[in-house]
Amino acid sequence: MYYLPRPKDSAQGDEVAIASHSDRERLRFADFRFSRTPDGRCSAQVGLDWTDGSRASGSASGQSSPMVDLRVSAEATLRALDAYTNNAYGFELIGVKAVRAFDANIIIVSVSLKQGPGPQRLLGACLVEEDLVRGSALAVLNATNRVLGNFIATR
């Protein structure tokens, strides 16, 4: 916790307690593996760790190409999230796109929820220096961050 001064017109005490980000429990992006085979296929494995030591993992594969590689990475991440939430949301990848903007590579993903409360479409992005495929997985985590935070808080 950290404290902020209370506004002067407040009748209560001098400080307001604000929960810091470290006070919230979060899934950790613990493991990412991506490989291409000589026959032109690719596969991705994603591992997410929880504070109690448990792990949720997901994998996906497909025919390798620059765009399919990004999609496979995003799908593996969504499968790991489905494993963690026991399919509470039914995440589905709508699309993934790599764009060049402001002299940087940006990965953008769109994810839909088949069930559960909250918005039905989520959007996430990740600024990427080199590893676009890993950036795709991180963009999925950015898209689903608020939904997962609510899921974790109500467990």
Task: Give each language-model segment a name.
Residues 30-36, 94-99:
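Short amphipathic beta-strand and strand-loop transition segments with alternating hydrophobic
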Residues 78-132:
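Short, solvent-exposed interaction modules
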Residues 2-35:
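Extended amphipathic alpha-helical scaffolds
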Residues 39-41, 68, 72, 131, ...:
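Conserved active-site and cofactor/substrate-binding residues in soluble primary-metabolism enzymes
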Residues 1-12, 47-55, 59, 151-155:
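Intrinsically disordered, low-complexity regions
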Residues 57-59, 115-155:
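Mixed-charge, glycine-accented linear interaction segment located at domain edges/termini
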Residues 33-56, 105-118:
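Short beta-strand elements
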Residues 48, 56-79:
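Acidic (E/D-rich), amphipathic helical modules within compact regulatory domains
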